[in-house]
Design a protein with these regions (language model features):
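A generic secondary-structure signal
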Residues: 31, 101-105, 156-164
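Short, function-defining helix-loop hinge/capping sites that tune catalysis or transport
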Residues: 25, 52-54, 112, 123-124, ...
Length: 181
């Protein structure tokens, strides 16, 4: 691997479920990989749901059982000259080490690693995993409980993790989701 190549670690993270973390992880990874040509990998560390792994398995089964979908998938992957990005199931407490091992063993340089993390700081290793991210994106909704929880979560990241200085975090970005139009 090129020593100058810098892989970016990204997580969509929040203390609440149902705000869109897994959806945004999938959408962003897919756009970067399939549309913009970046090499990405996703680590699904959201125990016990592991919704991204389940989605991958469900989608693969659906494609393999349908000739029309097989042809479309073949056309897509030959057109862009890329395989599907990998989704790897792992535990939050050692996901950073697993990601670094994957990057080191990869034949192609990995541009971005996305992490689908559990929605609670009570999960073993979650604060360490968050401290290893370069960019954290936090979806918020117009629900008072979710907003308060998100602000407390963001304050925790800034006051506890970032002020200690033992972090890779460059940005924490809050954004609105599920907004009525």
């Amino acid at each position: 691997m090129n020593a100058k190549h810098k892989t970016v670690f990204i997580a969509f993270s929040s203390q609440k479920g149902g705000v869109g973390k897994s959806t945004f992880t999938t959408l962003t990874a897919s756009i970067l990989h399939y549309r913009l040509g970046y090499n990405v990998v996703v680590f699904d560390a959201d125990f016990p749901q592991h919704s991204l792994i389940k989605m991958k398995e469900r989608d693969l089964k659906m494609v393999m059982e349908n000739e029309a979908l097989k042809k479309l998938a073949y056309k897509q992957f030959t057109t862009i000259n890329k395989k599907a990005y990998e989704i790897i199931q792992h535990r939050a407490d050692s996901v950073l080490e697993a990601a670094n091992e994957f990057i080191g063993a990869s034949a192609i340089p990995i541009d971005a690693v996305f992490f689908d993390l559990p929605g609670t700081v009570n999960t073993p290793g979650i604060l360490k995993a968050l401290a290893g991210m370069h960019h954290i994106f936090t979806p918020i909704t117009a629900d008072r409980v979710i907003m308060e929880s998100t602000l407390v979560f963001t304050q925790l990241l800034q006051d506890v993790i970032m002020k200690k200085g033992e972090t890779a975090i460059k940005t924490i970005n809050l954004f609105w989701n599920q907004v009525d139009g």
